[in-house]
């Protein structure tokens, strides 16, 4: 039986574990993120296929099983594309992370062209399309995820002209002058214009894509509407946008556009936070700190995350306000990037250097200003810090959304706590009750941490309640529902978009 739904995602939907010479497949350990939600839609389809890549060695190639039944679900198939270590390196570690990533995040000086392997990237995207089409109905819905698979819609459209193709962009989409630095810009845009629906986190990213498309191709804007101000801040902050283009026409093909940011899973997060083991973890952290304020910064090592700027601001805080020495503690959870990700090595070294300098300058016999974790914390450990932290300091220089900010709010519910959030994180236009700051401006950063430390409990609770309610209204399930609803309706000419 052919699949009516095909999900294309660079990760497999489970963890493969070897124990005692046997292979087991287990759910991803984090209860949050989009994976559980995608899997629920995947399982509920009459017949579905999930396409991902799998790195294998030459020895494994001979006995490699490309198609596997989804554990416990006979109607679902995982189609794994075997890639060699060199293919993965060139496709993911170099071309995706050293060429595309810096452009998407508006860091053009980090862009690498010479080592990029465009032909390898094209080949792997075509392999994804071939695998996706192999078992798909002629009118199947293909849901393609993220920039790693930019070219896949084009190859699918060649093979399945009547298919519905939806694409969701999980990163920022930059301004036209930045995106057009990419030497392969025309091929990327041509592929995205093959889609029936292109989804982005924010109206700003939609408008940036429209500007790029109009700069390279003769596209017609066929529908533009005011931004839904119940969902997004329309004016007054860095990523605000008052209007959104919701449909383009190119060569008699309609491309629907929409903004619907990924949500969290508040129910699961709250259940985990309220577990006795998590509450005990929170209690122990608070007991160890005493009356000290706990500030938390969490995120992987990446030059776009603004960790360096945050650390320098913390150093200024201890200089400006010496009375806070021994009264505040900063926990930095900055997990090292996976091996092979050479682009992040300098960022890691800079973080470690700054933490060493600050601790060396200000540490007392009974107080260390910063506790740095460079190994990944378990989700349970991270939730313990979320629950214990008085302040979450999330100030990326650029971020498509930033789910950590939402997770911190959910961990606190309607209780006290303060979120400092960069204006350049996509979630800032969803969470106006955070303390929004500009990580490029030292004075604004100083003012934001001072405001957070001084905020009365009543104001903390009011702001947190407002943010928590917003996150509850548009959780990860609503995000996926929205995507499927809009994708299935794309064939209706002139259809009005459903509000977020």
Curated annotation (Swiss-Prot):
Pathway: Glycan metabolism; glucosylglycerol biosynthesis. GO terms for biological process: glucosylglycerol biosynthetic process; trehalose biosynthetic process. InterPro entries: Gluc_glyc_Psyn, Glyco_trans_20. Induction: By salt shock. Its EC number is 2.4.1.213. Pfam families: Glyco_transf_20. It catalyses: ADP-alpha-D-glucose + sn-glycerol 3-phosphate = 2-O-(alpha-D-glucopyranosyl)-sn-glycerol 3-phosphate + ADP + H(+). GO terms for molecular function: alpha,alpha-trehalose-phosphate synthase (UDP-forming) activity; glucosylglycerol-phosphate synthase activity. The keyword Glycosyltransferase applies. Keywords: Glycosyltransferase, Stress response, Transferase. The keyword Glycosyltransferase applies. It is an enzyme of class 2 (transferase). Belongs to the glycosyltransferase 20 family. PANTHER family: BCDNA.GH08860, TREHALOSE-6-PHOSPHATE SYNTHASE. Involved in salt tolerance by producing GG-phosphate from ADP-glucose and glycerol-3-phosphate (G3P), an intermediate in the synthesis of the osmolyte glucosylglycerol (GG). This is Glucosylglycerol-phosphate synthase. The lineage of its organism: Bacteria, Bacillati, Cyanobacteriota, Cyanophyceae, Oscillatoriophycideae.
């Amino acid at each position: 039986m052919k699949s009516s739904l095909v999900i294309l995602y660079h990760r497999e939907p489970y963890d493969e574990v070897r124990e005692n010479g046997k292979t087991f497949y287990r759910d991803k350990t984090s209860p949050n993120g989009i994976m559980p939600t995608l899997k629920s839609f995947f399982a509920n389809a009459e017949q579905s296929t999930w396409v991902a890549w799998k790195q294998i060695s030459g020895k494994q190639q001979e006995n490699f099983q490309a198609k596997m039944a989804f554990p416990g679900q006979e109607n679902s198939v995982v189609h794994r594309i075997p890639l060699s270590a060199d293919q993965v390196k060139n496709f993911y570690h170099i071309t995706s992370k050293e060429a595309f990533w810096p452009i998407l995040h508006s860091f053009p000086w980090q862009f690498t062209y010479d080592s990029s392997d465009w032909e390898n990237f094209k080949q792997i995207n075509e392999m994804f399309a071939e695998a996706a089409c192999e078992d798909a109905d002629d009118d199947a819905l293909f849901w393609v995820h993220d920039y790693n698979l930019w070219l896949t819609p084009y190859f699918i459209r060649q093979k399945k002209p009547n298919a519905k193709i939806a694409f969701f962009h999980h990163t920022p989409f930059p301004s036209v002058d930045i995106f057009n630095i990419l030497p392969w810009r025309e091929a990327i845009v041509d592929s995205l214009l093959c889609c029936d629906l292109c989804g982005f986190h924010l109206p700003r990213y939609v408008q940036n894509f429209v500007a790029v498309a109009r700069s390279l191709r003769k596209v017609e804007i066929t529908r533009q509407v005011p931004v839904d101000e119940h969902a997004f801040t329309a004016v007054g902050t860095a990523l605000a946008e008052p209007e959104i283009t919701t449909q383009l026409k190119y060569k008699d093909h309609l491309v629907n556009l929409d903004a619907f940011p990924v949500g969290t899973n508040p129910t699961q997060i709250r259940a985990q936070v309220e577990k006795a083991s998590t509450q005990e973890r929170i209690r122990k952290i608070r007991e160890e700190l005493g009356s000290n304020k706990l500030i938390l910064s969490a995120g992987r090592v990446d030059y776009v995350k603004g960790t360096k700027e945050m650390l320098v601001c913390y150093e200024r805080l201890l200089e400006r306000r010496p009375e806070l020495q021994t009264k505040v503690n900063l926990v930095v959870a900055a997990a090292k990037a996976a091996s092979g990700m050479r682009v992040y090595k300098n960022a890691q070294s800079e973080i470690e250097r700054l933490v060493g300098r600050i601790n060396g300058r200000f540490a007392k016999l009974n107080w260390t200003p910063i506790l740095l974790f460079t190994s990944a914390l378990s989700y349970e450990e991270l939730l313990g810090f979320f629950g214990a932290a008085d302040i979450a300091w999330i100030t990326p220089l650029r971020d498509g959304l930033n789910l950590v900010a939402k997770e911190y709010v959910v961990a606190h519910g309607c209780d006290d706590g303060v979120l400092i959030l960069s204006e350049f994180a996509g979630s800032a236009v969803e969470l106006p009750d955070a303390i929004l700051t500009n990580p490029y401006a030292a004075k604004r950063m100083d003012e934001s941490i001072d405001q957070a430390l001084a905020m009365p409990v009543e104001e903390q609770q009011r702001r947190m309640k407002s943010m928590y309610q917003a996150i509850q209204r548009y959780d990860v399930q609503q995000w996926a529902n929205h995507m499927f609803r809009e994708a299935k309706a794309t064939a209706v000419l002139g259809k009005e978009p459903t509000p977020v």
